[in-house]
UniProtKB/Swiss-Prot annotation:
Entry-linked SUPFAM superfamilies: Thiolase-like (SSF53901)
Major site of localization recorded for this protein: mitochondrion
Single GO term (MF): metal ion binding
Name of the protein in its database record: Acetyl-CoA acetyltransferase erg10A, mitochondrial
Encoding gene, per UniProt annotation: erg10A
Any Pfam family matching the protein: Thiolase_C
Length: 433
C-alpha cells in the first residue's frame, strides 16, 4: 500500500479548495454573510418573594421557584410561548437539585419540551449573566424571544460526604457544608468571602459605623418600599403546600428584621481579633428565591410589549475580572466598560442597582465610582431584601426596571466570587417604534 506524504496530501487539498466556491465555504468573508447587530429588548420581569433561610420556601426546590418566576414573566410579556426558543437560568448551589436545573424550571413553567435550556453558574452574577447571554442570541439574530433569570434555594443545600474510597478505615468522619463549599468560600485564599469584605473595608477606609449605617438605611428603604407597595408589580406569589394546606407567600420575609439598637452590638462575623467590622447585620442574608425576564427582538417588542411596565432596551453589558480577594470592587471595573459601550456617562444614569453582598461592597464602589450622591438602591437591597445567590443578579434588574421612567437609563451591577462582576445598562421605554 502506498504511503501518502503530508506534502502530497496538502497539495491535493489546496487543489480541491481552488474548485470549491468561496461563497459555499463555512467561513466566508463575503459581505453578504455579515449580519448587523440587532437591538435586544426586555419585555417583562417578575420575581418571587425572597424567603428567609429555612423559611417559607424550605420545601420548594430552586427549579420550582424558577418556574413560578418564568411563568409570571411570560404571562406579563404577552409573547406567545411558541416564540420562546431558549431559557437561561442562573443557579449556583446545584447539589441534589437534579439534572439540568434550568431545564427543570422551563418544563415546570409549562414551556414546550422543544425549548432549549442552559444553567449558568457565575456565582452571585449568574442571573445577570444569564440575561446577557440571552440578549446576545437576539442581538446576533439567532432568536426572537428568550427567557433569562436566576434561582436559588440556599435552605436546601446538602452537606457533602466523600465517597467511601476517600474515607478513613476508622475514626471520625467530617461532613462539608455545601453552602460554604460552593457558595461562600474563596477557593484561592481558603477563607470566607467575608474576609474579602474585611480587606476591602480596610483598604478603602470604610468604618464599622459606616457599614452599620448603610445597613440600617437598606432596611429602612425596603420597609418604606413595601409600605408604599413599590414591589407589587414585580412579585410573583408562590403557593407552598404544607401539612395544614396551602400557603401563598406574597412578600419578602427578612426586611422587617431590623433592630437599630442591636446593630452596633453585633460581634464581627469573620475577624475576631479586635479589628473586624463585618457583621451579620451589615452583610447580606442567606435566602431562597427566583427571578426571570422575557427578552425579545425589535419585532417582538413592537408587536407584544407596547405599554408593558418593564419594557426596556438593553443598551450594553460588560464583565470584568480582578484579583479574587478584591471581588467586592469588581463592579467598579465592569461599570465603566458598560457605560463606555453604552455611550453614556454616569451622570446620565437615573437609578443604580448594586448587589449588597456586604455594606462594604456598596461603600467601596460608591467611593471608587464617585456615586456618593447618586440614587443607589433606593428601595433597599440584598442586606434587607435578601441574597438568593443565583437569582440576585436578575432580581436587581427586575427591581431596577420597575423604578425607571420612560427614557431614563439604569445600571445593574453585581460582583461575584472568584474576583469578577457583571454590569448592564438599560433604557426604559414606553413603546418600540
Amino acid at each position: 500500500m502506498a504511503i501518502q506524504t503530508t506534502t502530497g496530501l496538502a497539495a491535493r487539498l489546496v487543489a480541491k479548495r481552488a474548485t470549491f466556491p468561496a461563497s459555499r465555504r463555512n467561513f466566508s468573508a463575503s459581505r453578504s454573510a455579515l449580519k448587523e447587530i440587532q437591538e435586544a429588548y426586555i419585555l417583562s420581569g417578575a420575581r418571587t418573594p425572597t424567603a428567609k433561610f429555612n423559611g417559607s420556601f424550605v420545601s420548594v426546590s430552586a427549579p420550582e421557584l424558577g418556574a413560578v418566576a418564568i411563568k409570571s414573566a411570560v404571562s406579563k410579556s404577552g409573547v406567545p410561548v411558541e416564540k420562546i426558543t431558549d431559557v437561561y437560568m442562573g443557579n449556583v448551589l446545584q447539589g441534589a437539585v437534579g439534572q439540568a436545573p434550568a431545564r427543570q424550571a422551563s418544563m415546570f413553567a409549562g414551556l414546550s419540551p422543544t425549548v432549549e435550556s442552559m444553567t449558568v453558574n457565575k456565582v452571585c452574577a449568574s442571573g445577570l449573566k444569564a440575561v446577557a447571554l440571552a440578549a446576545q442570541n437576539i442581538q446576533l439574530g439567532l432568536a426572537e424571544a428568550q427567557v433569562a433569570g436566576g434561582m436559588e434555594n440556599m435552605s436546601r443545600v446538602p452537606y457533602y460526604l466523600p465517597r467511601s474510597t476517600q474515607l478513613p478505615p476508622f475514626g471520625e468522619i467530617k461532613l462539608q457544608d455545601g453552602l460554604i463549599q460552593d457558595g461562600l468560600w474563596d477557593v484561592y485564599n481558603q477563607f470566607h468571602m467575608g474576609i474579602c469584605a474585611e480587606k476591602t473595608a480596610k483598604k478603602y477606609e470604610i468604618s464599622r459605623e459606616e457599614q452599620d449605617q448603610y445597613a440600617i438605611q437598606s432596611y429602612q428603604r425596603a420597609q418604606a418600599a413595601w409600605k408604599e407597595n413599590k414591589f407589587a408589580e414585580e412579585i410573583a406569589p408562590v403557593t407552598v403546600k404544607g401539612k395544614k394546606g396551602e400557603t401563598v407567600v406574597e412578600r419578602d420575609e427578612g426586611y422587617e428584621n431590623l433592630r437599630i439598637d442591636k446593630m452596633a452590638t453585633l460581634k464581627p462575623a469573620f475577624l475576631r481579633d479586635g479589628t473586624g467590622t463585618v457583621t451579620a447585620g451589615n452583610a447580606s442574608t442567606m435566602n431562597d428565591g427566583a427571578s426571570a425576564l422575557v427578552l425579545g427582538s425589535k419585532a417582538i417588542a413592537r408587536e407584544f410589549a407596547q405599554g408593558n411596565r418593564a419594557l426596556a432596551r438593553i443598551v450594553s453589558t460588560a464583565d470584568a475580572a480582578i484579583d479574587p480577594v478584591d471581588f467586592p470592587v469588581a463592579p467598579a471595573k465592569a461599570v465603566p466598560i458598560a457605560l463606555e459601550r453604552a455611550g453614556i456617562t454616569k451622570d446620565q444614569v437615573a437609578v443604580w442597582e448594586f448587589n449588597e453582598a456586604f455594606a462594604a461592597v456598596i461603600k467601596a464602589n460608591e467611593k471608587i465610582l464617585g456615586l456618593q450622591n447618586a440614587r443607589v438602591n433606593p428601595l433597599g437591597g440584598a442586606i434587607s431584601l435578601g441574597h438568593a445567590l443565583g437569582s440576585s443578579g436578575s432580581r436587581i434588574l427586575v427591581t431596577l426596571l420597575h423604578q425607571l421612567q420612560p427614557g431614563e437609563y439604569g445600571v445593574a451591577a453585581i460582583c461575584n466570587g472568584g474576583g469578577a462582576a457583571t454590569a448592564m445598562v438599560v433604557q426604559k421605554l414606553d413603546r418600540v417604534d
